[in-house]
Every structure is written in C-alpha cells, then in structure tokens.
Amino acid sequence: MKTGLVLEGGGLRGVFTAGVLDAFLEGNFHADYVIGVSAGAANGVSYVSGQKERGLRTNTDYLHDPRYMGLRSLLLHRSLFGMDFIFREIPQHLDPFDYQAFHENPCKFWTGAIDIRTGETVYFGKEEIGDDLEALRATTSLPLLSQPVAYQ
C-alpha cells in the first residue's frame, strides 16, 4: 500500500508538523507522496531529505534574528519575513539543506502557489525544487506581508 502526507501551512501549525515529521523519521516511516503548502512545504522538504530536526531548527533558532522576521525587513524589503535569509542564507550556509538526499529520495513531492494573474493554483514537483528554493518562497509568500514571487 502506498502512503501520502498532506502538510498544512501556518506558522504555529508548521512547528507542530515539524515535530510530527521528526517522529516519523525516528520511527523510520517514509511516505511515498508528500504535498505541502507554505510551512507544510518547507517542513516537507526537510522530511523528504531525511533531515531530522531541521524543520524545527529553521522555525525556532532564528526567530529572534532580525534577518528572519521583523519591522526592519518590512521597511527595507517590503516583506515582514526576510525571504533571502530564510531561503538562501539558512539553507545554503547556516543550516544546509541536503538537496542531493531530497532529489535521490524516491518519495514524490509537490507544493502549490497561487498565480496572482489568474487566481489558479500552480503546482511544483520535486524536479522544480532547485538550490534557489523559489518554489518554496512562492508557496510561503503571504499577500501584504511579503513580496509576490516571479517564478517561471
């Protein structure tokens, strides 16, 4: 039997989900399919890459870092969240994301974002998750709190 996980968005729900996914990794439970939006997608990629506790760390270790979130970011970049910090600095330098493990895992992964021109959901598969993590940036972008993401 094939198994799938659907991971919801939402900041606090995302922290809870990160813990559940860590328990799955500890218990050696590996889903065949993972789909997530927003925080669910961000946690889902860490789960698929097998990086236990990475989702929790990225949600808690940088919470008080002004580069992560805050008024300064909103004023300088018109985004409450420091998207470059979250999707470039953290995964490439501070808490490296294992792109190779993610792409080599046979688990299928998808995320979705809204195309602001059409209002339709656009889905991104694992093959579209590159080292710039733009698909994740798109799914986590919040109207009025962050800039829209031009992707493809």
Label every model-predicted segment.
Residues M1-V37, V45-Q152:
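Patatin-like phospholipase
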